[in-house]
Amino acid sequence: MASRANVPPARAQAVDQSVARLFEAFDRVPVAAVIRHAEDLPRALASQVPAIFFVRAPAFHLGPLVWAVQARGKMAFVHIDLIAGLGKDRAGVAFLAREIGVNGIITSHSGLVAAARADRVIAVQRLLLYDDLGLHSAMAAVEHARPDIVEVQPAVIFPLVADLIRARHPVPIIVGGFVTEPHQREAALQRGARAISTSTVSLWP
């Protein structure tokens, strides 16, 4: 499996720069807008959020959506696991990276994290945490895949596991899932999350 040690230096440098640029923007506005419905995109484009996460969009709609985001100076991420009509494999990753030109790919699968890294886009590994067993399995998956960013869901779990995750894997953390109120956003940020991801329009500044 790919790791930073055996990824070509040009890839590592380019993606490191993209990650640094993203988190410089998150330092100012620590919110990524999650788009489940196309009608929400204009509001996200008009907001100050530096990144937009696409989930559940049909594959044949993705190009114009991603390009509209990038035209506004924002970064576009696609959750490959949830995109209808797109292979959940290396070919699907290559299509998003090379044909669409996404800034990053979100996935729960370690193999797709490696594929995203190989294709020189930001790799975000989503961790769905429900119990202690799931936490330890997730930690092993992150250690194996070495993503650029970890997204922890649901947000209510993060304060309970934040110290363990940061101790084992010092990569930037985004928190999402059921972030619907300002106090939930602030709780995640206070526990060390660099940003939150949410589809709640009222939380997009």
Language-model-detected regions and their locations in the chain:
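Short, charged, surface-exposed secondary-structure boundary motifs
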Residues: 61-68, 86-88, 132-141, 160, ...
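Short loop/helix-cap segments at secondary-structure boundaries that form the rim of catalytic
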Residues: 43-47, 113-118, 165, 187-188, ...
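Glycine-rich phosphate-binding active-site loops on the catalytic face of alpha/beta enzymes
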Residues: 52-58, 111-112, 154-157, 177-205
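Conserved N-terminal beta1-alpha1 strand-loop-helix module at the mouth
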Residues: 2-80, 84-86, 101-102
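Catalytic cores of alpha/beta
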Residues: 41-44, 91-96, 138-144, 161-169, ...
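Catalytic beta/alpha-barrel core
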Residues: 32-36, 50-59, 77-85, 99-110, ...
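Alpha-helix-loop-beta-strand connector modules within alpha/beta enzyme cores
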Residues: 63-82, 90-91, 98-100, 114-126, ...
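A mid-sequence interfacial segment
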Residues: 13-15, 20, 109-144, 149
